[in-house]
Amino acid sequence: CRWLATQAENLGVEIYPGFAAADILYDDNGVVKGVITGDMGVGKDGEPSDRFMPGMELRGKYTFFAEGVRGSLSKKIIKKFELDKESCPQKYAIGIKELWEIDPKNHKPGLVLHTQGWPLSKGSAGGSWMYHLDNNQVSVGFVVNLDYENPYLSPYEEFQRFKLHPSIKDYFKNGKRISYGARAIN
């Protein structure tokens, strides 16, 4: 994300990390023209404190809503413009990722691997990735759609099984997981 942010900023895109959009700005014709950020410096009682700053209007030729799963503003946009009128319901999944520092002899800078299916069984869908980054680091992850049929399926355990595949496991030999995370995605 940092790399992509740098590329966007080099093209003139303004990015405001730490400022949540609280509402949508529309012009007189109902066209989205930006967002209003949330107020800052609001006390626990909901009243403005001595450090209060009202939300800012951020206007742009283009406004991208990248809130993640079930974002509040995205829901408003979908409803207002009936974006779900002639479409299938959204699909949801869980994505699990890890960052590894691996043995230099197992590192192949630039290697990209994407898979689909295994080790998931019938009635489940998903896939994985593995990216060999700089500094002997590997990003590895696994995504499982949340509409799986087996109530006992554990996405985390399936991810661990994936890393034991004969074509994958040797990359992690003598390696160390240095960070991990999970996120709902749609």
Where are these regions (language model features)?
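Predominantly flavin-linked oxidoreductase catalytic cores and closely associated redox partners
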Residues: 7-170
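A glycine-rich dinucleotide-binding beta-alpha-beta segment and adjacent secondary-structure elements
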Residues: 171-186
